[in-house]
Amino acid sequence: MPKYVLTGVGGNVGSIAASYALEIAPPGSTLVFTTSNLDKIPSETRRVWSEKGATITTASYDDISSLQRVFAGAQAVTLISTWAFGRRPQQAQNVIDAAKSCGVRRICYTSFVGADDPSPIPEMPFLPRDHKQTEALIRASGLEYNIQRDFLYIDNIPNFFAPSWEFCGNRWLSNSGGVPGAYVAREDCGRVLAALLLGRGEPNTVYNVTGPEAVTDAQIFQWICSNIKDQGQFVTVSDQEMKDYWLPRGLPTTVSEVSQLPMKLCIDDLVCCGEMVARGYMAKTSNTVETLTGRKPLSFEDVLEKYKDVF
């Protein structure tokens, strides 16, 4: 009975992956789901997962012994990137060390578009930097791997951007430069992770996980205004203009600071979201979602319709 360990199920991607893994797991598979804190998972969700045969327990990327406890006897494990910017490569090394000590054969990692940028890390955009380091650690580990480079989630727009539009004078300030980007549904990223964990990918392969088409932020905004609720004005700004607007208003400069503003991203994270699109990192689509899950990727309209009460 092969054992598969899905870590980080208390988060959005991990939770989606867990539910899909239970749908597609071959008969006789052992599924172990871990979270750093069981309270992150609704009790009803835990009940459903348990009834379907999953074991749910705690483990932390910062605690190698907790990882070794759950990795023992596993064929494959996952590493879902966290919000611990700067500390993520060490968390990855902990997972790698624990996996190797337990005889795990394969690791599946949720990376990010742009992690293959050949530039020196300090010259790369902010968001892919840790991912480039982590991918290098995984390749050097000797473990078999599957890496999925997720594009920016379309879910980020209702979750992180829309709450700030009223604060900005009913405007979406965008530094994406009018360049199209293939935003992906977070749901599809979770499903891809489950598929890779359960062996649907090719060994030692990197997959770009994208939406079905590349669209501009202005197109997305126009669709929201026409189909959900008029949000005001779409305004194109430069990276520097974005900083000049937000920094005097108190937007945090580091991830560790908690924003008191409707915009909850720190300035580097916020600017980089637009930069990734503007510089063409997200211009090309892939067939990864359909190949690995058997379902076409969700469109931005599909996703935003689910968030219509947010706008």
Regions found by a protein language model. Name each.
Residues S43-S50, A54-Q75:
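Conserved Rossmann-fold cofactor-binding substructure of NAD(P)-dependent oxidoreductases
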Residues T7, I80, G294:
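Residues lining the SAM
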